[in-house]
Amino acid sequence: MAELMAMGNDVVHVAVKSDVRESRSTLLWALRNLGAKKVCILHVYQPKTASPAARKLEELEAIMYETLHDYFDFCQQEGVNEDDIYISCIEMNDVKQGILELIHESKIKKLVMGAASDHHYSEKMFDLKSRKAKYVYQHAPSSCEVMFMCDGHLIYTKEANLEDCMGETESEAGQSKPKLYSSASPKCSAELVSAIVAYIDTRRDRDMLEPNASEDQSESDRNDQLYRQLKQALMEVEESKREAYEECVRRFKAENTAVEAIRSAREYEAMYNEEAKLRKEGKEALAKQRKMVEKTKQERDDALIIILNGRKLYNEELRRRVEAEEMLGKEKEEHERTKKEIEEVRAIVQDGTLYNEQLRHRKEMEESMKRQEEELEKTKKEKEEACMISKNLMQLYEDEVRQRKEAEELVKRRREELEKVKKEKEEACSVGQNFMRLYEEEARRRKGTEEELSKVAAEKDAASSVCSEILLLLQSYTRRHGTPSGFSDEDSVTRQPPSYFICPISQEVMREPRVAADGFTYEAESLREWLDNGHETSPMTNLKLAHNNLVPNHALRSAIQEWLQRNS
């Protein structure tokens, strides 16, 4: 404890709960953001009994180790040395009072504690929610800087008063003997050894600074020997105490394990008894249910047998009754019919109207025969007329069938013609594509020809001069000797233009050649007239043009102009 008081601001105190999951974020923030060399974990142990008796130091240390060893391991995982981790614990029912007690005992200058549980955190949280945090904020010494955390975020900081810090430091320096031991610290033995060694070193340094110390060498040797003996004794005490502490911890763990095992065994025994009881009751209930099911099934079978037998008897009785009713109905009908016939015969015999009735029937039959003959003649005439109409209708039907066949043949021929036209169009498209390819090749050849023509131009000029001289000689010769047979001026002058100089529409030499969408070259004016007259197809391929854009053919135009100049 004295060592922690002596280090002052180098130690960060963090108040934690017994469960590491509840205070892990607070401890992690303190280790990563405050940059302290040493850390001290504060914990207030709340006993389970309302009024706990005084505990021994070893028992309290065992409880602290059992409760806070997870924090110790967590600090080591974050890179803190084992010698730089301290644990300060106090046993008290009131947690906030315990925290204040630890602050006063350890003279804490910097404390980190929770402002509320982590699940209460929100971005708009700026106030303290926990009653313990509010109490510590109100009653903590002004020399202690307290930082309140929630879910790894700093919520509020209580700043320390520097004047009060200086006053407390001076008052601590004026004290003759510091408090070297605290029953609440599990490392009290190590702190005691460190404090005693520091005290002896201080005394030794002070004696060495005195003027007479250098003269008495024997006194110094004795002090050194005493110092070594004392240090050896303290190390043995420390080792013994550590072994006692470890034994206490092991015993405490063993007792807890035994108690837990006994409790678990009792719980398992109770659960087994309860399960056995439920199983027995379930078996009994299942046996009763099976008996009831068997009984119900037997009753159902008996009832079904009775119902089936009764239904058979009912159906048999119903069938007999229906047959008897049918026989009775037939006998009644036969009796009524016989009675009526007897009465009719009796009436005819008594009145003497049987003969008269026969005569009347004969006359009626003769009249009906005459009417039937007349109707037969009339029907015969109607049938003859109907036959003529049917014959005409048959002829009309045959004509219609013949016309229908002709129409079908015409449609078939039309389809064949359409397919043929379609094929011709496809062939024309392929021909147009070939023409385009040939035109491109012709353009390339023409370009080469133009280059050759430019080279031959000089030769032509020389040839023309020679020709002119020859013509002069020929003219002079003809004037002297006459014109030779089979030789005229027209044959020497007349020259026909190439076929690709002629427009396919006007059949004249083109002046402004333009390339259309079908790949052929036309005279610009003639092709515009063709398009203005409503034509949308190519004059050469008779296919629809993709567009009406005309591209000037400069190479062909220059060739035509050169030809015209030579033949002008």
Curated annotation (Swiss-Prot):
PROSITE patterns named among the record's database cross-references: U_BOX
Keywords: Coiled coil, Transferase, Ubl conjugation pathway
The protein's name in its UniProt record: Putative U-box domain-containing protein 55
Coiled-coil blocks: 217-464
GO molecular function: ubiquitin-protein transferase activity
GO biological process: protein ubiquitination
Gene3D superfamilies: HUPs (3.40.50.620), Zinc/RING finger domain, C3HC4 (zinc finger) (3.30.40.10)
Highest taxon, organism lineage: Eukaryota
Assigned EC number: 2.3.2.27
Pathway where it operates: Protein modification; protein ubiquitination
The keyword Transferase belongs to this UniProt entry's keyword annotation: yes
Top EC category: transferase
Reactions catalysed, as given in the entry: S-ubiquitinyl-[E2 ubiquitin-conjugating enzyme]-L-cysteine + [acceptor protein]-L-lysine = [E2 ubiquitin-conjugating enzyme]-L-cysteine + N(6)-ubiquitinyl-[acceptor protein]-L-lysine
Summary of the function given for this chain in its UniProt record: Functions as an E3 ubiquitin ligase.
Annotated organism of origin: Arabidopsis thaliana
Domain U-box: 496-568
